[in-house]
């Protein structure tokens, strides 16, 4: 090894961790308690939906996408939630559409709860402006915490992570483990191919007729909130698929 190189390197000193701001809470408990993991997962999903929209979880991309309409829709949704008096629940990042929906909510004086895994704090640049920022140990805890904090869900354009979050809550609803509204915000027809894929699943007998009742498609922020409120006030009938208990 080149001694002249190592000789000139700075001596790193151990840094003491800085105290977290008051709005940041680090959650260290594991997502799956070893004594009874299945019960711990299912229990939160079994609760009955509330009758008013107190908080909406928004799934969206940590990137802004190629069309300015995506960011505009995200900002509009955040502002509409603030005006409605509903709390915004997000993945806790400050970039892309996640940051834009936070911008809209905070500019309107709304409350924002961010939930971010510790290992993503630097990659997604945790939004320290959040009213409450929950730092959780892993992705499973993130999704579960977001679910527990929300009365309804709205999905904006996003990538693989957004699809992961979306399919999980749709699957749980199909299995009758929750009946919270799931709103698909179809900005610039972004989700139209996904909706076509749902239909293809049905046509190829991989999904049952009635699967379309699991989600509600909207095209504006105002429509998203109205759809969530309407469904919370008058929940959709639980879709009974063949082969499931109660059919």
Where do the protein language model's features map onto the residues?
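A cross-family phosphate/adenosyl-ligand binding-site feature
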Residues: 22-149, 187-247
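Short, positively charged and aromatic/hydrophobic N-terminal segments
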Residues: 13-17, 22-23
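Polybasic, lysine-enriched low-complexity intrinsically disordered terminal tails
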Residues: 5, 18, 27-29
């Amino acid at each position: 090894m080149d001694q002249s190189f190592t000789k000139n390197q700075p001596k790193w000193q151990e840094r003491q961790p800085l105290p977290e701001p008051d709005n940041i809470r680090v959650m260290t408990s594991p997502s799956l308690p070893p004594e009874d993991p299945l019960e711990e997962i299912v229990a939160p999903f079994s609760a009955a939906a509330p009758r008013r929209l107190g908080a909406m979880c928004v799934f969206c991309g940590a990137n802004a996408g190629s069309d300015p309409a995506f960011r505009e829709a995200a900002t509009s949704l955040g502002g509409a939630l603030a005006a409605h008096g509903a709390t915004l629940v997000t993945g806790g990042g400050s970039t892309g559409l996640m940051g834009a929906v936070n911008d809209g909510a905070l500019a309107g004086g709304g409350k924002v709860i961010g939930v971010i895994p510790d290992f993503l704090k630097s990659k997604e640049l945790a939004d320290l402006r959040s009213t409450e920022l929950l730092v959780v140990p892993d992705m499973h805890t993130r999704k579960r915490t977001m679910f527990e904090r929300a009365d309804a869900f709205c999905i904006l354009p996003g990538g693989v992570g957004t699809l992961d979050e979306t399919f999980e809550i749709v699957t749980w609803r199909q299995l009758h483990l929750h009946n919270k509204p799931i709103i698909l915000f179809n900005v610039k027809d972004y989700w139209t191919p996904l909706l076509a894929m749902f239909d293809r699943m049905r046509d190829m007998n991989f999904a049952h007729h009635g699967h379309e009742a699991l989600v509600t498609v909207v095209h504006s922020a105002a429509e998203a909130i109205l759809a969530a409120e309407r469904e919370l006030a008058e929940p959709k009938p639980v879709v009974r698929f063949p082969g499931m208990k109660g059919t």
